[in-house]
């Protein structure tokens, strides 16, 4: 009836699944191995024996003999299971295996074995030295590949057009040598010097030249070692005149003159006593930290105040303070207009502890 649940016993939950899989796999492998050992013409009951015995037994045409209780008897291998041929080897001639009854079978059996051995070896040799047909492609591509990769065509059996191939190879070798010479001549002038001050006539002449290094906006100057004329120096367009390129090499004297002159020992000693200067300032003005100058750099910059004496350092109220002076870094006129920056000069008479600083009052409240 529909909806009924039927329990099908396949595997118990208590059974080990791994054990079942291992047993199944081992049985499957044994079955495959037995099928591989079984010969094609052997019966099923001989599947567990090595094929060498089956091969030995069935290559002997007709009946064969074995020695048993001093009686010579013939046994048909198809009538019995064939265990005698496996367990009992065929004895040699001194034991009377092949006697006068069937003496003519011995050379026949030997010839059959030799023929089978020769045919088997011949088949193996044919399979080993079998030549597969080559891939048919473009003959030009094939010739190019033969020149590029000759080791791939070392065992080639193609003997057609040998004379033509030899002549083509000679021509190709000549072409290759010419190409190599051209490449060598080109690479001699590959290290060229760039000159940004190129003349228009030279630029226009290089655009029409056959040199592989043609550029429309650049000038390439050849090394001084190239005495022969090149496409760059000998080419011309519209009969325009241009100057010959000059070399970029300089003499050793020019190179020494171009080097910067370093300071000597005497100049270093004199520089220690002189005040330091700034490169972006005029030569007559020095740094602010120098105490030897009295001239002001700008209109709003005054000379720095001297530090108070040790007795005055204890009480800042005795120190002179100029709040309107631009020498104070945090409270100058060029800063933002906050709070006591713009206070009166009369407030400078107040002690430093009672004066407000910036936008803050003495009680750390915002100044308004």
From Swiss-Prot:
Skewed-composition ranges (Polar residues): 183-194, 241-254, 297-311
Domain of life: Eukaryota
Region feature Disordered, mapped onto this chain: 156-213, 228-259, 291-319
Residue spans of biased composition, Low complexity class: 156-182, 195-213, 228-240
Protein name per UniProt: Uncharacterized protein YBL081W
Organism classification: Eukaryota, Fungi, Dikarya, Ascomycota, Saccharomycotina
């Amino acid at each position: 009836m529909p909806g009924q649940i039927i329990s099908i016993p396949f595997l118990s939950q208590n059974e080990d699944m791994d054990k079942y899989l291992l047993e199944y796999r081992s049985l499957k492998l044994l079955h495959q191995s037995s099928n591989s050992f079984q010969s094609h013409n052997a019966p099923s009951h001989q599947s567990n024996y090595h094929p060498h015995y089956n091969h030995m037994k069935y290559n002997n045409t007709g009946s064969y003999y074995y020695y048993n209780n001093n009686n010579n008897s013939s046994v048909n291998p198809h009538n019995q299971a064939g265990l005698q041929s496996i367990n009992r080897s065929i004895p040699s001639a001194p034991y009377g295996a092949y006697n006068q009854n069937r003496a003519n079978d011995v050379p026949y059996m030997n010839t059959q074995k030799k023929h089978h051995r020769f045919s088997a070896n011949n088949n193996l040799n044919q399979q080993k030295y079998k030549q597969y047909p080559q891939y048919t492609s473009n003959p030009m591509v094939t010739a190019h590949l033969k020149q590029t990769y000759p080791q791939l065509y070392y065992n080639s059996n193609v003997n057609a057009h040998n004379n033509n191939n030899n002549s083509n190879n000679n021509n190709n070798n000549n072409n290759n040598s010419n190409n190599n010479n051209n490449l060598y001549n080109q690479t001699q002038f590959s290290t060229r010097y760039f000159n940004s001050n190129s003349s228009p006539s030279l630029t226009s002449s290089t655009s029409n030249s056959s040199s592989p290094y043609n550029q429309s906006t650049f000038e390439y100057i050849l090394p001084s070692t190239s005495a022969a004329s090149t496409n760059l120096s000998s080419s011309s367009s519209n009969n325009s005149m241009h100057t010959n390129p000059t070399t970029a090499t300089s003499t050793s004297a020019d190179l020494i003159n171009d080097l910067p002159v370093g300071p000597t020992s005497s100049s270093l000693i004199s520089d220690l006593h002189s005040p330091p200067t700034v490169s972006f300032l005029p030569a007559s003005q020095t740094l602010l930290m120098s105490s030897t100058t009295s001239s002001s750099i700008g209109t709003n910059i005054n000379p720095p105040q001297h530090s108070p004496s040790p007795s005055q350092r204890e009480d800042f109220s005795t120190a002179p303070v100029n709040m309107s002076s631009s020498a104070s870094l945090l409270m100058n006129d060029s800063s933002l207009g906050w709070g006591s920056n713009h206070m009166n000069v009369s407030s400078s008479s107040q002690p430093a502890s009672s004066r407000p600083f910036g936008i803050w009052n003495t009680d750390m409240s915002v100044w308004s």
